[in-house]
Amino acid sequence: MLVITNRNISKGFASSGIGDETAFGEQLNTDDPNEDHIANAQKTKGKWVVELVKEPKNLTSDNLPSRAQFEHVLQRCKDNKKNCLFFVHGYNKPFEETLEQGWKLQTRYNLEVVLFSWPSNTGGFPIEEYKNVKRVARTSTGAIDSSF
């Protein structure tokens, strides 16, 4: 499953590029909330493996990781005669839960899922958290727009 997110990246995951359901946190990307991270997620024997897609030092229109990853998704759709679903989750979803929801959709409906995961579970007193998440959702529009 292809994962696109503007969540903050955990330190260990950033350096190794290999992680699990804790690879991304519950806050906005600290570098830039409109900057997406791209990863591939696979659930094997009940365990998540999340692999960060590294960017080349010199990005050009010919070597964009997002383009290459989406081309892989489209090829899998063609090869396996599957449809593709771009899934954006709702409010109050930790990263692990968004992975689970995307995975269930993918397996239940035999689809290729591209998951956009945004920090919708920032914590705190419920009313204040809701207001904060509303601001985060507005801020995330640039990130989701760039993923399209």
In which residue ranges do the predicted regions lie?
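Flexible, membrane-associating and regulatory peripheral segments of lipid-active enzymes
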Residues: 1-114, 123-128, 132-135, 139, ...
